[in-house]
Regions:
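A short, aliphatic-rich alpha-helical micro-motif
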Residues: 73-74, 151
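Conserved P-loop
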Residues: 2-72
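Residues at the starts of beta-strands that form the adenosine-phosphate
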Residues: 26-29, 77, 117, 156
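A generic alpha-to-beta junction signature in SAM-dependent methyltransferases
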Residues: 72-73, 114
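Short, hinge-like loop/turn segments at secondary-structure boundaries
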Residues: 47-49, 75-76, 137-138
Length: 173
């Protein structure tokens, strides 16, 4: 099953995704896309790391997400990807539109063939005002397009607000 868990910053989306991974009763691999480039991000990573069960495997991959999913997906495994918007940020910061398109398309193209459970976590960025800066507008647009394409392919899509899940597609939680 493919699941997409959306929400704003500190909405409870990662905690929900972690609970779903635990509830799957499968072997879990956590795929982290962040690059802790400053102290605050390092603290966030440490917080997430401390909350995860020790038996979960960890793969850190900031760019080649489709490759890691193809290599790691198994029928008896749950892959938890946290998060897609950081992955998108990493690609945007390369300032290589062709690479971004190739990586995004590779991700979307591989999903149907992946066995097991895949849970994606991502920040919902499209509910605010239109950003003033060009790069920020592009980020919000790319995230919105990615979320739409993923939601089409996922069996369950959940929006998390204030720690509460709102199922948008699929079986309610």
């Amino acid at each position: 099953m493919l699941q997409l868990i959306l929400g704003g910053a500190r909405s409870g989306k990662s905690r929900l995704a972690e609970k779903l991974a635990i509830d799957s009763a499968l072997t879990v691999t956590y795929i982290a896309t962040s690059q802790p480039l400053d102290g605050e991000m390092s603290e966030r990573v440490a917080h997430h790391r401390a909350r995860r069960p020790a038996e979960w495997a960890l793969i850190e991959e900031p760019l080649e997400l489709a490759r890691v999913l193809r290599e790691s997906a198994r029928a008896d495994h749950c892959l938890l990807v946290d998060c897609l918007t950081l992955w998108l940020t990493n690609l945007l910061m390369l300032d290589d539109a062709e690479r971004l398109t190739a990586e995004r398309d590779a991700l979307l193209d591989c999903l149907a063939s992946l066995p097991g459970e895949i849970i994606f976590v991502s920040n919902e960025t499209g509910m605010g005002v239109v950003p003033l800066g060009e790069l920020t507008r592009r980020y919000v647009d790319e995230a919105g397009w990615l979320h739409q394409a993923l939601a089409e392919r996922c069996q369950r899509v959940v929006l998390t607000v204030a720690g509460l899940p709102l199922t948008l597609k699929g079986t309610a939680l």
